[in-house]
Amino acid sequence: MMLEDFKIQWFPGHMTKAKRMMESQIKLVDVVVEMLDARIPRSSTNPMLQDILGSKPKVIALNKIDMADKAQTDVWLEKIKHSGLPVCKIDCATGKGVKQLISAVQLAAKPVIDKWLKKGVRNRPVRVMIVGIPNVGKSTLINRLVGKNKVMAADKPGVTRGQQWVTIAKGLELLDTPGVLWPKFDDPSVGFALAVTGAIKEDVFDREQAVELLLDLLIRKYPQDLLNKYAVSLEQGDDVNAVMAKIAVARGCLKSGGQLDIDKVVQLVLRDFRAGRLGRFTIDEP
């Protein structure tokens, strides 16, 4: 399968509502934190956000760094810095980099705070809106900052509840927003990246096609990690179908009679990739 053939169009009604809520709340916000997936920094950048956010100070939080290729992450960091935006690499699951993110937000808010002080306004919390695609880790970040599970999160795209302000002890008031996608992915590589990382519900794309493309990418860029995980050998001339067959045999993904159960292989590879069990991979090239 060619990447150009991978098509997705997904814009649930609740995302339209979330976008409208975000537009109405932006007037109350002092700083915006846009969370990106470090494995797909380009694909997880929502092109609609700039129109919504306007000139608000923005900090980029590159999340899930422990699942991404370290060398590629460093290149992405420099690229984002070169664009003029402050950026922090974080891992919300472990708390890595979260303190640095708080410092970056406070620094971005300093011009706003200085204006308040000139007007005699004191002790007002800095209001921060956290934005990003589904499953990028917004609620996990707030849970980490608050220190308790005040924001319910689920490992499914588009299920975080309505917007809510959460006050934390660092003089920040955070707004968690439901993940918002855009209605059409003009670049099929973006749809593919969002699909395999779990930002899009699986019922709107062909999982087997997605895994074929993913395996093709891993064979080209990270063959040793892939082979080590599934204990298979890669012979010259092996294509994606051959590799899927080898994984099926190695992992017992077989139907009665010894037929390959490709659907089980697809589920296995997707699950392992999303959990970071295959290794540290970056899909988007800087």
Regions found by a protein language model. Name each.
Residues 1-31, 39-48, 52-58, 65, ...:
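Helix-rich effector regions associated with P-loop NTPase G domains
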Residues 127-147, 151, 177:
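Glycine-rich phosphate-binding P-loop
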Residues 92, 142, 172-175:
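Conserved active-site beta-strand-loop modules that form the wall/rim of enzyme catalytic pockets
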Residues 34:
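Redox-cofactor binding/interface segments in oxidoreductases and associated redox assembly factors
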Residues 100, 104, 140, 213, ...:
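Alpha-helical scaffold segments in soluble metabolic enzymes
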Residues 59, 66-131, 150, 251-254:
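Canonical P-loop GTPase G-domain recognition
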Residues 49-51, 77, 146:
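Short, solvent-exposed amphipathic alpha-helical segments in soluble enzyme
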